[in-house]
Swiss-Prot record:
Top-level taxonomy: Eukaryota, Viridiplantae, Streptophyta, Embryophyta, Tracheophyta
One Gene Ontology term, aspect cellular component: ribosome
Keywords assigned: Ribonucleoprotein, Ribosomal protein
Name of this chain's protein: Small ribosomal subunit protein eS12
Biological-process GO terms, alphabetical: translation
Length: 143
């Protein structure tokens, strides 16, 4: 009469979310939107894929790193976004953008390591509705 003990439930480790009632800043909201978009296979990384996605009118939002060292790269992305009416948001670092896009290894503590920089990301599909998406859309409309 051996009874099996139930297996312990392990909760997935997530990025720290802001406390309820506390306003979410744009960068946290953008990170949340990218995570949801990546889960729904709606994230495009890199110049070539981003340019193709913008040209096909599939892009809803473009995120560009400010510390990109290729001026032609920045000029091309900005011109494509302006031509095809795609909203452009800039973030300070390519490393943080790469981390948000999932271009890194996650260690046992849930921290990102071996982060690869990413200069441009295009969101084709937002995934599901969230508070972060509302904040990003309000920011884009105000520009």
């Amino acid at each position: 009469m051996a009874e099996e003990a139930p297996a312990p439930v392990v909760a997935p480790v997530e990025a720290p979310t802001p406390i309820l009632g506390e306003p979410m800043d744009l960068m946290t909201a953008l990170q949340l939107v990218m995570k949801k978009s990546s889960a729904h296979d709606g994230l495009v990384k890199g110049l070539r894929e981003a340019a193709k996605s913008i040209e096909k009118h599939a892009a809803q939002l473009c995120v560009l790193a400010e510390d990109c060292d290729q001026p032609d790269y920045v000029k091309l992305v900005k011109a494509l976004c302006a031509e095809h009416n795609v909203h452009l948001v800039t973030v300070p670092s390519a490393k943080t953008l790469g981390e948000w896009a999932g271009l890194c290894k996650i260690d046992t503590e849930g921290k990102a390591r071996k982060v690869v920089g990413c200069s441009c990301i295009v969101v084709k599909d937002y995934g599901e509705e969230s508070e972060g998406l509302n904040i990003v859309q309000q920011y884009v409309k105000s520009q």
